Amino acid sequence: MEKEKFYSRFTEKKSAKADAQNKRKEFNKQRDKYFDDKRRGLDKKEVNFSDKKNIPLDAKILSSANMFNYDKMPADALKVLESFDSIVQSIRPMNSRQMQKLPKDIRALSHQLTDERETRNVSYMNATEQLSAYIRYFTWWNLVRLTRVFANLPSDSFNLKDDSVVIDIGSGPLTVVTALWLARPELRNKKLIVYCMDISQSTMAVGEEIYMSVAAKAVASDANAEGFWKIIRVKGEIGTEIKRRANLITCANMFNELYQKDHDAPEKIADKQIRNLFNYASEDCSFFIAEPGMPVAGRFISLMRERFLQKGLKVASPCPHQKDCPMNGLHARYGGSEKWCNFSFSTENAPSKLLKLSESAGLPKERAVISFIMAQPGKIADKKNLREKDSLSVAIVSDPIYLAGHRQGFYSCSENGMVLVVNAYGKKIKSGDVLEFTMLRPYSSLQKDKKSGAPEITI
């Protein structure tokens, strides 16, 4: 056997590093090309709705609401989000040299969270540079997403009272807790006990400082209120014992990381995690789960939704029905073609400094994407055949797609399954819209989309 040359260990390391760098460059190139092509494609395929005359309609819109309505955001929450970088700087200051390097650190961490996630250390946020990059960029964007979702959830989504218990699993820098405080002012007056669980004690400690600073700026309306919730930090991962039973359990951007170390089938992972969640839950517990808008996460959300329904809970949002998920992302982890549930909203109202930081890091965002579910105790609608019903609720899931004949469509979710909503007359429709229709023709007579097989509803 040939003896290893003394320098081989160094050249191999250098080669591995070079391969990683080349992989990263290629990823950047392909991603930038994708978004450039998409933007150019959208520009080319603008539909001239003035040319659409006398197109027969399948349905008439009775009502419309959007699950990311910017106008539902509290004014003080918007001010905090706009100045979030200043809040972080007061708690975890960076010098000019570190600030100059921040965009590069953000981009490097972005790779660890995406194309390099398989080799990422699970305790990545214990590193100083990575924690700073995460809080100053990813936490900021997550707050933008989560506050928009929380502010638009139904008014009865958080039936919490004084001394109610909240358990936030995978807390990181307490992003969910901070977002909930900002987006739901009625909860600021409550004496809540919030257990925050994460494997990184230092990350939670920084997050608690951020939360307390935010609570001092976005104050409770009741002058006699405590002014903040009681935070109890628990070091550990899901399954770690907590003696109190929860009235609300939240998890954001946590379950997708399980795929890094759990190679069971998604169904088995969901079975395991639903048991873990219910081990913490009281009888009246509600659940909120949010994950990144990517196929594997969308598939997992759909599996958890199925299990919540089996447990007798109702889905308060985002689904317009309690039936089987028609966009369940089956085989998503293997690149399957099935549609998967994720929503997006425009970043035009995002904090200006955050948008600028995104540009500096080479990660421009025109859309914020999220997959989520809110499940709570309540009566489930009877599972009867509603296919000929005069009214139909649909949730617009996709961004606009361009169909043959210069038409514009949106893949959407309904109690009858996936449908393709065809926008014939230039109505303002976007992902996250929940539309109530009156059907003008029998559902069974609708034309089918050739690509997906979904019934087309022209409005």
Which functions belong to the PLM regions below?
Residues 206-243:
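S-adenosyl-L-methionine
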Residues 298-302, 306, 313-377:
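Class I S-adenosyl-L-methionine
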Residues 283-291:
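Conserved beta-strand signature within the Rossmann-like core of class I S-adenosyl-L-methionine
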Residues 247-267:
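A short SAM/SAH-binding and catalytic strip from SAM-dependent methyltransferases
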Residues 349-459:
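C-terminal lobe and adjacent flexible extensions of AdoMet/dcAdoMet transferase-like proteins
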Residues 173-189:
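Conserved SAM-binding loop of SAM-dependent methyltransferases across substrates and taxa
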Residues 120-156:
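Class I SAM-dependent methyltransferase Rossmann-like catalytic core
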Residues 4-17, 23-120:
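N-terminal auxiliary segments of SAM/dcSAM-dependent transferases
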